[in-house]
């Protein structure tokens, strides 16, 4: 596969941003080690945003010949008060639920879970050099910048937080350097950590990634944040500014009821959540159901997506590109209920192997039911 094809795989949907494509091309050209990583807090059930969006990109990275790694951020979850802030519970959930849930998600998106390395944060934290890296980074970042970056842990600026939470962003940057990551991957909400990493890499006393004597910059790949199904806090949205702000806040999240479909949800739950979803007729700018169609169903184009309707409502219709579907919806030729039902059916089929796995192996979900999901 040539370099342009490999770059196109990295750029493929749901990628929203690559910092920068030139540096990525350079990594390929000089034959640098291609070490990817994506980190997750261990906080609750895996939803379509965390499982399928990350899983899809992991599949693409593997096809592009990049080594893939999932970083199970147990210490970070403890700092961020997840699962009652109990490190032992967090580690148990990481190894017995989260790992297998991500493996299954990667598989349904066409990747090979056996080629993904899973690393628990506490394994690398034990090494003394890790903390030296954290301090080195901290000496190159201002306090106000650290405070602005707490959004990477789902916290808001101005929120009252304990001091440990200010160490977290520096740890996330250290995780990149310490693991020799050349391709740091996450959803768009994590970009602040990666921008710090790219800048600070140039300022440290030692350089974190050296290849054949050359100091390389890490590359950041950010995927689209899948919208949650809930209604936005204000409607209609009247300005571009307001639109951007709302979109950033309205990502699918397990903490918002009816926002998320979980990877193990039953067909009935999926149908019910979609039936209640925010999906006004003709609305194509802010529409979570269309957002899911674009980033999950039409990730590959052309693809055949058939919407079944009774003859009196126009009969079956098949779309091969997202643009065709969007156009019909905008013109009122496709009813929200028909779109919702078809997206629900697609997801039920896509998630079937995961559901069946958890039916055969109920222990991970039993464990999840026994833990306290906080925040
Ligand atoms: N809706 C989403 N769409 C795509 N990626 C997501 C989404 N939500 C989270 N991610 C990504 O998954 C990774 C883990 O994020 P995080 O732990 O915040 O997810 P979460 O389970 O949705 O958390 P929370 O429900 O507390 O917001 C990050 O890279 C993040 O950008
Ligand atoms: N901040 C990430 C989790 C994370 C933690 C450490 C990392 O090195 C990377 C990612 C989130 O909230 O989803």
From Swiss-Prot:
A Pfam family per the record: tRNA-synt_1b
InterPro entries: aa-tRNA-synth_Ic, Rossmann-like_a/b/a_fold, Tyr-tRNA-ligase, Tyr-tRNA-ligase_4, Tyr-tRNA-ligase_arc/euk-type, Tyr-tRNA_synthase
Keywords: Aminoacyl-tRNA synthetase, ATP-binding, Cytoplasm, Ligase, Nucleotide-binding, Protein biosynthesis
EC number: 6.1.1.1
CDD domains: TyrRS_core
Keyword rRNA processing: no
Residues binding L-tyrosine: 37, 168, 172, 175, 190
GO MF annotation list: ATP binding; tyrosine-tRNA ligase activity
Gene3D superfamilies in the cross-refs: HUPs, Tyrosyl-Transfer RNA Synthetase
Highest taxon listed in the record's lineage: Archaea
Motif ('KMSKS' region): 251-255
Main localization category: cytoplasm
SUPFAM superfamilies: Nucleotidylyl transferase
GO CC, alphabetical: cytoplasm
Catalytic activity: tRNA(Tyr) + L-tyrosine + ATP = L-tyrosyl-tRNA(Tyr) + AMP + diphosphate + H(+)
Known function: Catalyzes the attachment of tyrosine to tRNA(Tyr) in a two-step reaction: tyrosine is first activated by ATP to form Tyr-AMP and then transferred to the acceptor end of tRNA(Tyr).
Family to which this protein belongs: Belongs to the class-I aminoacyl-tRNA synthetase family. TyrS type 4 subfamily.
Subunit structure: Homodimer.
PANTHER family documented for this protein: TYROSINE--TRNA LIGASE, CYTOPLASMIC, TYROSINE-TRNA LIGASE
Protein name: Tyrosine--tRNA ligase
Organism annotation: Pyrococcus abyssi (strain GE5 / Orsay)
């Amino acid at each position: 596969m040539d370099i342009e094809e490999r770059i196109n795989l990295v750029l493929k949907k749901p990628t929203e941003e690559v910092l920068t494509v030139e540096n990525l091309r350079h990594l390929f050209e000089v034959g640098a080690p291609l070490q990817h990583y994506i980190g997750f807090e261990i906080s609750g059930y895996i939803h379509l945003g965390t499982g399928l969006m990350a899983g899809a990109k992991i599949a693409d990275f593997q096809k592009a010949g990049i080594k893939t790694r999932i970083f199970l951020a147990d210490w970070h979850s403890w700092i961020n008060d997840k699962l009652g802030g109990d490190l032992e519970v967090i580690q148990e959930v990481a190894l017995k639920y989260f790992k297998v849930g991500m493996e299954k998600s990667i598989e349904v998106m066409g990747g090979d879970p056996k080629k993904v390395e899973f690393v628990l944060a506490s394994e690398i934290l034990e090494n003394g050099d890790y903390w030296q890296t954290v301090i080195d980074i901290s000496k190159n970042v201002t306090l106000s910048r650290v405070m602005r970056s707490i959004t990477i842990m789902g916290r808001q600026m101005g929120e009252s937080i304990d001091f440990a939470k200010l160490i977290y962003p520096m740890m996330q940057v250290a995780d990149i350097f310490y693991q020799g990551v050349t391709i740091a991957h996450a959803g768009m909400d994590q970009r602040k950590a990666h921008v710090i990493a790219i800048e600070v890499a140039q300022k440290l006393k030692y350089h974190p990634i050296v290849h054949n004597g050359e100091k390389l910059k890490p590359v950041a790949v950010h995927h689209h944040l899948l919208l949650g199904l809930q209604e936005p806090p204000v409607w209609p949205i009247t300005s571009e500014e307001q639109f951007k702000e709302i979109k950033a806040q309205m990502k699918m999240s397990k903490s918002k009821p009816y926002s998320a479909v979980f990877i193990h949800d039953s067909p009935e739950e999926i149908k019910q959540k979609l039936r209640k979803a925010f999906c006004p007729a003709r609305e194509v700018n802010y529409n979570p159901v269309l957002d899911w169609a674009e980033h999950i169903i039409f990730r590959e184009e052309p693809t055949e997506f058939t919407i079944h309707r009774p003859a009196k409502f126009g009969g079956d219709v098949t779309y091969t590109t997202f643009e065709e579907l969007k156009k019909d919806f905008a013109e009122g030729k496709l009813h929200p209920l028909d779109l919702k039902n078809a997206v629900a059916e697609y997801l039920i089929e896509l998630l079937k192997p995961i559901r069946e796995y958890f039916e055969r192996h109920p222990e991970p979900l039993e464990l999840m039911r026994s833990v306290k999901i906080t925040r």
